[in-house]
Amino acid sequence: MFIVVEGGEGAGKTQFTQALSKRLMEEGKEVVLTREPGGSALGEQLRDLVLDVTQEISSYAELLLFLAARAQHIQEKILPALESGKTVICDRFHDSTIVYQGIAGGLGEAFVTDLCYRVVGDEPFLPDITFLLDLPEKEGLLRKTRQKNLDRFEQKPTSFHRAAREGFISLAERSPDRYKILDALLPTEVSVDQALLQIRALI
């Protein structure tokens, strides 16, 4: 099973994915926990580049860097894990690119979606289920400001993050069979319990 966790800055995706992975392993599942951008040696190098606040990267170059990292990630890590029967949990995937670069970033949802869906062939490679950790953008940014070092996206204006939140919600509402919205203001363990109910329903 391929599980993706999406959400804006400060939504608690890392904590959630780690807790969900632990619970699934306790149930006897073999779990691969990964992230985007990243997940491979090349992907992690591209992650460092694209999040670096000292870099001035054009919108299209930024998009292509994310797609390059994803293509390598899918082929090197995600597909082999799924083919061996493991459960893959990924912190961000296509929809983060569609939202951040396409909707909030202004490149266009349809254009970015088409590229994302062709990153490893003619057929879109999609997760079995996507959890959206949703919270008001101001709350997410407040959580992030408690950190010392903010990356290029965390430093973007509130208007960008508001558009991103609206974009995620729009995608979720249009794909209710795949998407499940979780309240990121709730304790992580509560959200994980809710997610496990949804996952078990698919097994």
Curated annotation (Swiss-Prot):
Chemical reaction(s) catalysed: dTMP + ATP = dTDP + ADP
Function, as annotated: Phosphorylation of dTMP to form dTDP in both de novo and salvage pathways of dTTP synthesis.
UniProt xrefs under PROSITE patterns: THYMIDYLATE_KINASE
Source taxonomy: Bacteria, Pseudomonadati, Chlamydiota, Chlamydiia, Chlamydiales
Name the record gives this protein: Thymidylate kinase
Family: Belongs to the thymidylate kinase family.
EC number(s) stated in the UniProt entry for this protein: 2.7.4.9
Amino acids binding ATP: G7, G8, E9, G10, A11, G12, K13, T14
